[in-house]
Amino acid sequence: MDKVYILVLLLMIIPILICIKYAGKVKSEVASSIVKCLVLMIITILSNGVFVLSDNQLFSYVMEGLYLFSFDVLLIYILQYSQQYTQVFSEVTLFRTGCFVVAGLDGISLLLNVFFHHVFTLKAENYISFQMYHISDKTIFYYLHYGFSYCLMFCIIASFLTKIVQISDFYRKKYVPILGVFCVIVILNIVCNISEFPLDISLLFFVFASILICYLTLYRSPKELIDKTLSIVVAGMNNAVICF
């Protein structure tokens, strides 16, 4: 079971590493944000994966805290990416700094939880003859953590929805798939959180998200978009000739 699970983790991480390689070749702010998102995806996947495999309670506390913290920071960078990609709102440095401060304080709280258990406690249970720790008792600090996370998720979804509403159909192909897979991640994350299942199933869709983000943002322009752009250029040239 352990070997199969480790193999699954590797199969998830390898495509993301390939995306990091290709995104790193593009010199732009949005490409830089994508690389940061992808690196944090790997940290989030590994921390949750190691948490599931761990049979040591203290180490499980550390890994679950790292997973929750890295997910926070990942969402902040996805929000930064969505701002740069959709351009439906201007980047507010004070807001971004505030998000990092809140995430940092949350990270410190999660680290202290290893010793004081003031955010959540862990309990060992058997899942299909396999013992795993899962979050048992939750405090107000745990709900505040997820309240912050879901606020970031809402902002990300809102930015993509706003962009999709504002643009024509042939532009939407660069935004709808990313929004779709992100919504799946959000829904599965909520389901896993409510059910207290140790393994975050939503992480499986990080692979699809990383590929879509890199491909649609950095490497692909829809054929209709290219045709439309060329038609505008040709029309402009014709108008210029007529005026001349």
Describe each region flagged by the PLM.
Residues 220-244:
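Sensory modules in modular signal-transduction proteins
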Residues 2, 24, 167-229:
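Interfacial "cap-and-anchor" motif at the non-cytosolic start of specific transmembrane alpha-helices
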Residues 4-55, 63-80, 99-116, 178-194:
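Hydrophobic alpha-helical transmembrane segments of multi-pass membrane proteins
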Residues 1-15, 138-150:
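Hydrophobic transmembrane alpha-helical segments in integral membrane proteins
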Residues 43-51, 105-129, 140-198:
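Hydrophobic transmembrane alpha-helices
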